[in-house]
């Protein structure tokens, strides 16, 4: 497929001219001029999710021009290439087929002339059988006791994704306690080990390559701790499991080959929650619920593949994002889930988006001259309202935001959810329309009496509005709807990367830092210490590290 420089397309040039016409139009004027705006700029999907993108600084013409850009960049052809198993991850010469992991229709997906679905289904069956044994208490630890705790050791996609999903689906949780360890800081693992009993705990070592330093370091320490209690290596077979694409490395670590749940090199780490790397999810919510989770994602996959441009939700949201980053010069996008169970959702898509599209070199190897991936951040509502919404409302930054809320809560505590929904609706309304001087004048009952003081304070109270948002309403957070929602965001990221003409499925920037860390480790480790010198800052920090370390007994 030919790589296209988007700034050379006719659509991009048309958008630049159009932006001059609309950049100062206010959202309240767009709504006043079209009482059908909500109907035109919203999609109700599968009777489960409403996507309202009417509070964006776009007109019907804007949308037409953005869709023209998607067509000129051959987005639908790119989608077909991904779904067909073409090696679109060209810098690593790999296919990108996480959609196969949730292919509930079981249609053939060929890779090297072989249907990969039989392998996918075999692993799913193995996950099902094992999870049922653990959940019903049949699987015993080395002392004959049933399992009570599961520790997932991974990092990046092997941690963020499963952790986010198990938290989001906590209402579906069974009796097992699920723990996640990712940070190489020994504190993370140490605090988990204090809470668990080695006799009733299993460890899932989640690493695609089984070489990731943080994961293997934590896994070795967990194994050492476990063997101190169990005394013999034979007991590992009851307690240690690998979720990996590298079977040899897992076996060399000491994992019984029967305890390895495989995934493949065509599964990117940040999409691995759908694979065996999501075994902790299955153990938390049960395989039946995991199947519903996969089904929800599959429904969104079908929508993404088959639906035309103008009704295709991931394409529309991707285009709107590019509109802000490249024409309004917004640098960040926020995700605000108004659901406490979803408290890790923003962090997960921070990684998924920024690791995918945080690139500055295009597919031809040239430096880009436009903006690529935005900074993604967010917190659950209403906590965020009392932390950083002040800046969104009245600051100097334009921060397009996604607001996500379920209409039905899992916890009907008095009128809590009604108040949560009210805050959700209020924030998107005020961000869009603001509050003007005239509004304050109408509300003021003491204006005549305190006119001078009122006028003095008034400028500080005015909110200009015109801050763009998407509102995403789910009927309820369930395995099915969460699967849909995650797949929606995944496909949005894919479309952005394709239009921006960058490779979204590598992460070379992450790899370089890890290599340098290995070099520094050898220098500051007493056993391998060498005389290598670094830049003055790094060397100065090393010297002070050694100073503090040597003085620690006296501090």
Curated annotation (Swiss-Prot):
Give the originating organism: Buchnera aphidicola subsp. Schizaphis graminum (strain Sg)
Q: What protein name is recorded for this chain?
A: Glucose-6-phosphate isomerase
Task: Please report which protein family the annotation says this sequence is part of.
Answer: Belongs to the GPI family.
Q: Which transformation does this protein catalyse, written as a reaction? A: alpha-D-glucose 6-phosphate = beta-D-fructose 6-phosphate
In this UniProt entry, which cysteines form S-S bonds? none
Q: Which of the seven top EC classes does this enzyme belong to?
A: isomerase
One of the protein's GO biological processes: gluconeogenesis
Name the Gene Ontology molecular function terms of this record.
carbohydrate derivative binding; glucose-6-phosphate isomerase activity; monosaccharide binding
Task: Cite the annotated pathway.
Answer: Carbohydrate biosynthesis; gluconeogenesis; Carbohydrate degradation; glycolysis; D-glyceraldehyde 3-phosphate and glycerone phosphate from D-glucose: step 2/4
CC per GO annotation: cytosol
Concerning PROSITE patterns, the annotation shows: P_GLUCOSE_ISOMERASE_1, P_GLUCOSE_ISOMERASE_2, P_GLUCOSE_ISOMERASE_3
